[in-house]
Amino acid sequence: SDLMICRYSYNYDEITQITPEPLYWESFNLAGDDLLKEIIQQIIIEGTVSNEQDRDCSGVIENHARQLGIPEVAKKLNGFFGKDSNNIGFKGKLMRINFINQIAIPIALRYMGHANKEGDLYLSFSDLFTTNPPGKELLDYFENHFGFRFEDIRWKLSPSKVNEITQSVFSKLVGQISGLVGLYNCDIVILSGKICSFQSLENLFLKYHPVTPNRLINLNNYWIGRWFPFADNNGYITDSKTVVAVGSLISYMGGTAHKLDRFKINNQHLCLKLVSTADYIGPVKQGVIQDVVLHAKNSDGTLIAHTLPFQIGFKNIDSIHYPSRNIYAIDFNDQKIIETLTRKGTTDASRLNDAVEAFKHKIRSRMPLKFTISREFDKDKELVVISEVTDNEQDDISKSYFELHTQTLPETTGYWLDSGEFTLNIRN
């Protein structure tokens, strides 16, 4: 999710010229995919039925299995959706990914599509998959694993359940954004993007009250006119993702090509002032940087790594409460280690992998390692290099054995949409 706060000025002398000046800009690692993940986990996979409203829309698979008296439900759920273990083979991982793509995501999108409507809607498997049904092999694998047919499950599309999850996912972020909007005394707030089409999310902004309701504009239901290339016959935007593309085109036509009649956009400030927000860099864990290592007045710093890979993040403001994002990871440089072993005479391909692992093991036995990293703040905030490495006895280790590579995802194993993994709440 992106936030931009601008000051706008304009001049009118036969030609109207608008000049946006960016005051604050930031991206946050929370968006529609995170909501999708929570809906899949809380509605489709696992959850408790605390009242009648939760029935058929909370942990549907788990509760359907419990109603049937299926033994070891938690074990079965973790064996299918949980983090990879030695018990999940290649086929299990493949079926898990297929389940997410063929079943979970389509069902979650149906729930999200019903979120702004009134009343619950009960659907069967055939109602959900009128087209593009999941493959028979996947459905058979599901039955073999859980002990019942997925097609027998009944689903209740509950707007209140989806809106409850939406507010729990975005409440903290909307509160922080509203605080920033209030700090800058913004006159108008514009919401865009598919995720803002949820009325519950718009209600969160109204709850935190960054501006008066009439100054909160949601482009998902804003009449823009039929001139917009992606508007419907009534002049409303059909796909909110097109707003950025069309806005960029208008900026180019009015600011560079000068092809808009008596209208210009002076984008000079946007070109000069929009720079990286990686002002503070340090070790990151669960989106939080406790100790800042590099900042504007400190071009060198040290990191203590007890394990590799080691995650490094950045943030715009030096506050423990300010959201941080991953940017780099320190890990072994396998290529350099192979080159070192080859020079020492290890050339047998069958032995090389074992030699590399043995080499890494020797380095790990000297942990914790102290990495000295540096950058030139004024030249490039994000260009960080490893300048020195020492072990737990202050002996030097060649820095060439390590690499600092881009790692913007918190999980080094990959994104959840690619792996299908979930961290489940284990219950007996």
Task: State each model region's role.
Residues 4-145, 257-344, 382-384:
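Phosphate-binding glycine-rich/basic clefts of nucleotide- and phosphate-handling proteins
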Residues 4-8, 192-194, 219:
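Generic beta-strand/beta-sheet core signal
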Residues 33-41, 168, 217-277, 419:
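Glycine-rich phosphate-binding/hydrolytic loop that grips phosphoryl groups
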Residues 200-219:
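Short acidic, glycine/proline-enriched helix-loop-strand junctions
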